[in-house]
């Protein structure tokens, strides 16, 4: 993989390419690119529609995760925020590739099970971090409805993760195949 391939993929999306290229290239430095994945998607928040792009770059020693979000502001118009996480491969936890298929049965498939033709509907890449955790807290309580005591907090600590979902219908078959290829290459490098 070359920087020119990554540049073409980012510029081709037309979503703040200068910002994203500068963010990724400054974090990448002189390191070689083993693989990359670019995912562009709409986002929904309350009553607004936005755009988000994730760029994952696998190097021999790190996984770079660039997240760029569109920010709509009536006073300033459209702007964007971009951040890059640099995760050493040794700190990457589980790398999960999930494939969802519909089983299409041919008319004579009952006699020949090999005649089932699975049809890929969507694919997910889930990355779990070993070093980052998310803590969700909420006020603790008791079963006495009249109790006014402070019971502190209760919560759950879970590993932070990231999920990228693609489907042939939304992203195209070629992008889904690229996701599968990227995920399998990453799985082979994480120990």
Feature locations, PLM:
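Anionic N-terminal interaction surfaces
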Residues: 1-62, 66-72
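Acidic, Ser/Thr- and proline-rich intrinsically disordered linker/docking segments
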Residues: 72-191
């Amino acid at each position: 993989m070359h920087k020119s391939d990554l540049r073409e993929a980012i510029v081709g999306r037309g979503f703040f390419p200068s910002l994203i290229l500068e963010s990724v290239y400054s974090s990448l430095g002189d390191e070689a690119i083993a693989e990359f994945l670019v995912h562009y998607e709409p986002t929904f928040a309350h009553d607004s529609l936005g755009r988000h792009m994730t760029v994952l770059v696998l190097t021999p020693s790190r996984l770079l995760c660039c997240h760029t979000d569109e920010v709509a502001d009536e006073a300033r118009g459209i702007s964007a925020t971009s951040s890059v996480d640099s995760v050493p491969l040794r700190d990457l936890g589980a790398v999960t590739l999930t494939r969802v298929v519909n089983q299409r049965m041919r008319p004579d498939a009952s006699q020949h099970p090999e005649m089932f033709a699975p049809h890929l509907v969507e694919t997910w890449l889930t990355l779990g971090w070993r070093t980052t955790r998310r803590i969700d807290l909420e006020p603790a309580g008791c079963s006495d409805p009249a109790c006014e005591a402070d019971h502190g907090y209760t919560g759950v600590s879970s590993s932070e993760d990231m999920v990228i979902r693609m489907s042939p219908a939304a992203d195209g078959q070629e992008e889904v195949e690229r996701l599968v290829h990227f995920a399998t290459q990453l799985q082979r490098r994480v120990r």
